């Protein structure tokens, strides 16, 4: 299950006991729409093991600025409160799954 990441809930989710994957996206972004179903599938596959969130960069500009998001989609992987990896652009399910597995 995906959660909506906002300026208000990000720190709580990031600092929780489960790893966090955040997909920074926008409604007008074609590549973001391309990977959205993949992100949803992985969110379901890793439910209870990894929190998967989506952060609309237009609604949450503070977070986008904090992480220097210049291109979308950008996916940032957090573990123990720290950003440990990042992917930029539309990537394959296999590549994303590899990164998710590394989070466990």
Predicted ranges, named:
Residues 1-51, 58-66, 70-74, 78-104:
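Proteins that catalyze or organize thiol-disulfide redox chemistry
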């Amino acid at each position: 299950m995906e959660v909506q990441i906002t300026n208000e809930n990000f720190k709580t989710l990031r600092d929780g006991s489960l790893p966090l994957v955040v997909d920074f996206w926008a409604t007008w972004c074609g590549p973001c729409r391309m990977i959205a179903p993949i992100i949803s599938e992985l969110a379901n596959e890793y439910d209870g093991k990894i929190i998967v969130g989506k952060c609309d960069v237009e609604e949450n500009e503070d977070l986008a600025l904090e992480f220097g998001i210049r291109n979308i989609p950008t996916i940032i992987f957090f573990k123990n409160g720290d950003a440990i990896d990042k992917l930029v652009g539309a990537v394959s399910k296999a590549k994303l799954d590899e990164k998710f597995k590394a989070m466990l």
